[in-house]
Amino acid sequence: MDPTSKRPPPAASSSTTYPPLPKLEILNPSALPSHRFLRPAKRINEGPDVSHFLTSKAYRDIGVWILQLNHALVPRIIKKSTTVSTSEPTTDGQQQQQQQQQRQQKAEEVDEQQQPPPPPPTDALAAKLQLLRKKRDEQQPTTTEEIKTFPLPRYRDGEGVENQEESESIKKLQRLLKKVEAIIDEAPPDPGPRRFGNVSFRTWFKLLEERADGLLREYLPGGVLRWEQGAGGEKKEEEEGTETETETETEGDSDKKTNEQKQEVVGPLEELKAYFLGGFGSAQRLDYGTGHELSFIMFLGGLWKLGGFEGEENDEDGEVERRIVLGVVEPYLRVIRRLILTYTLEPAGSHGVWGLDDHSFVPYIFGSAQYTRPISSPNEPTPLEGSVPNAPKPSDITKPTAVERYRTENMYFSAIGFIYDVKKGPFWEHSPILFDVSGIKDGWGKINKGMIKMYNAEVLSKFPVVQHFPFGSLFQWEKDPEAGVPVQSVHMQNQPVASAAVTGGVGIPTERPSGPGGVTGTAAPWAQAPAQAPAAGIGAGAGMAPPMTAAPWARSTGAGAGAGVGASAANRFTPFKPAGGPGGAPHTGPPPPESFPSGTPGTASNQFAVTKAPWTK
């Protein structure tokens, strides 16, 4: 087992008090008459728009929601008060005898209170009473600690969660996912030859679009439907073709074609539907990636905002959030994996072999949280290092037998197990970044911290990933008044500046953006022409090899650390800011081509140098 899991760092004292952790705001139903739901629209059309996104209210809400779910999965230390004997251990018979003596003693005490004082006891009786009082005094109250973890619920193939007590809202969402999965049987894959994804996925997606309204009305939690019932005025405006103008863009956007965008007023289900449908891939491109995964996560965030999970649980310690992740997010990932296998969906916005995973990211965040060092208070911050006792070692992901054992209880290993299902060959060869992460020696808390930083840098700060995320009234394009100005970095300078493809429907592009020379396709991130000369120390020229994207926390700290995309923006709230550090998204520029970066001995960056891929020796 992991050495760090046997001797985890000491948890904070139970007497320590912490301020409440940030949570995603739940909208007040009394604001319904004045709240206008908007049809989500595409706003990120070119690279510089990412800079605005990193200062928007939507970005703030995404960060808060991801960390709210993440913190709920961290193991807890449960304190229990018990009464134990300070004498030597006794057998069952001796324990029964002691209990009988205690009952006899209590009866004698009652008799003493009700009857006049007895005559002086004999020596034998006095000795017996003295022995009973001594044993009573040896029974002292004590506090024991129990570690509570949150594994995945047991699944039965084709039947969902087994023997799992869930709230009504979670059960409804599970039934919704079962209905979505059942549509696969109505759209079997096309048997003909193909180079990319199976065209039958478009048939499946069309069926989902046609049934989405009915499915959402039937299976969304009741707390959300009350907004739909009270949105009659907004629906009437929609039918009459009424439109509302959103706030004017920032002053820096004055050179764009228009400073204002018009968004159609709709009902709450119509706004939620955009994020729901966006969570199941692109029918046009026949692909699925982390941007689609983000859309579904924020669909759940929209349900949270509308009170879909409110009032059903005692949520003092993140119980509702845990049920959302374990009871909804994991079943959603299972549906997605079946879609990928059935229709051979292409990775969307992937770095290829140098990406963390072809299709997903959040299971690595939530799965590492499941094995993080336990906390003793609901508001104690997520540990940055250490592991729960008896957790598997991070290096166990390279052992198929260990992966098979843990994939049914942990989201990290479940995602690794899917990689083993679809890829062959040495693990270090097809998944080098995950292989590097397996060398971390500071426990699962260190991995969890790094995954969150990497998510901010490689998902939320990358144009190819976030360009299709739509903005409405639940997740607003409007600037967060507490946001700072994002730092311009090499990544920001290399963002594409050409206008994106024309969009339709819920903001999904109807055609691929044109690449260099008019070639249509999704170019690799490093293939973008730089907007200006590269910074000193960064190689240039047409013959430069594509850079390797190593895990962000594997960088050596020093001048310029944390100066990546959105560094300042991330500093404005706790979610993507490492405790005690400079904060912000890490610098993810290319390392020296001849080897992986090496850092100070005993640090994570040095550990990555030890676990570099074999061909770098």
UniProtKB/Swiss-Prot annotation:
GO molecular function: peptidyl-prolyl cis-trans isomerase activity; protein tyrosine phosphatase activator activity
Composition bias, Pro residues: 1-11
Bias (Acidic residues): 239-252
Major location category of this protein: cytoplasm
One GO cellular component term noted in the UniProt record for this chain: nucleus
GO biological process: mitotic spindle organization
Paired cysteines (S-S): none
Catalytic activity entry: [protein]-peptidylproline (omega=180) = [protein]-peptidylproline (omega=0)
EC code(s) of this entry: 5.2.1.8
Compositional bias (Low complexity): 94-104
Source species, domain of life: Eukaryota
Region entry Disordered, spans: 1-25, 84-169, 230-261, 376-398, 572-617
Keywords: Cytoplasm, Isomerase, Nucleus, Rotamase
Localization of this protein: Cytoplasm; Nucleus
Compositionally biased region (Polar residues): 84-93
Family: Belongs to the PTPA-type PPIase family.
Protein role: PPIases accelerate the folding of proteins. It catalyzes the cis-trans isomerization of proline imidic peptide bonds in oligopeptides. Acts as a regulatory subunit for PP2A-like phosphatases modulating their activity or substrate specificity, probably by inducing a conformational change in the catalytic subunit, a direct target of the PPIase. Can reactivate inactive phosphatase PP2A-phosphatase methylesterase complexes (PP2Ai) in presence of ATP and Mg(2+) by dissociating the inactive form from the complex.
Name the record gives this protein: Serine/threonine-protein phosphatase 2A activator 1
Provenance organism: Neurospora crassa (strain ATCC 24698 / 74-OR23-1A / CBS 708.71 / DSM 1257 / FGSC 987)
